[in-house]
Every structure is written in C-alpha cells, then in structure tokens.
Amino acid sequence: MELERRIERATQQGARAIVVRAGDFFGAGARSSLFSQGLVTQGKPVAAVALPGDPGVGHQWAYLPDVARTMVALLARRAQLAPFARFHFAGHWDADGTRIAAAIRRVVARRTGIEPRVRRFPWWLLRIAAPFHETLRGLVEMRYLWREDVRLDNRQLLAVLGEEPHTPLEQAVEATLLGLGCLPARADAPAGAGA
C-alpha cells in the first residue's frame, strides 16, 4: 500500500498511473506464484493438490492473460481516466476455497486418467523456514488472506470497460498446468482422456 501512496503522490506532480489490484496470479508464465509453488509443483505431474485456505474461506484468483487483456484495455482508454486510476480485477472467485483445487483435479483426471488427492497446505513448514527465506516470510505475512474472505469489487472496472476479460476456469487451469510442465502434451494423454 505504501507503494500505491507514493505513486498517487507522483500523479499530483504530473505523472499518470493505472493500478490494477487482483487476486493470486496463475498462468503458464507465473512460476513464482502460490499456484505454481504451493497448490502444485511446477515441472512435475500433479499427484496432489494442496489447499492453502481454511475450510469454507473464499479466495480470489487472477488468470494472468485476463489481467493482461484488462490492462491493455485500460491503457487504450487512459486519456479518459483520472491521473491516478485504481481498479479491482474480480477474476475467479473461489467461494469456499475448494473450487480451484477441484478444477485442477478435473483437468488432471481428464488429461491423465488419474485424479490427484487433496492435502492441506503446510503452513507450519513455511513458518519454520520463513526466518531464513524472504519469499517465505512474505507468504507467511499474507496468511490472513487464506483465513478470511477478501473479495475485490470490480464495478468501477466494469463501468469503464463494460466487461472484464474472463477465461473459463478449467480452460485457464489447463493452460497453466501445461505451461508449468505439470501435464503431458495432448498426444501423451491416455486414450479417451483428452478433450
């Protein structure tokens, strides 16, 4: 938030800025995300999906290609925006914290014939390692986002763009898993498992 305040102050001196807030990123190129380093392990077949949230707690996910299309659309309208324009990107709302894991399991089962198991995310392990690793410290600090619902309201974005780019969840998950090297190429999928 401090960075946003500094950016906003800069716009009072002639700079222009567009800020897009979004949920947890996922996508084929998002190699440093909780999706790619927590829910699944990039470069490995998905044997299990880790659930980082408390049961019943909703969470917001942002598919990077959709976020990119949103930013491009906002940039195309920058002349009509205030010098400091802040928007919320709704993305995919996982109302009970299990929807993304269920989508991963369905995609993997369809592509490989094997349904991954679900396990709890090992927050306890992160707390032990956090003092020695900056990224893990940051993750532990953001743990509250997995203990309480935090949902971004995209009405202002919709008022400007008319709609928010939105790839269907399973399509986005499949592209992400392929890009992370967690799924076999379509030709390697078992007979009858491909879409």
Language-model regions: role of each:
Residues 156-157:
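Hydrophobic/aromatic residues within transmembrane alpha-helices
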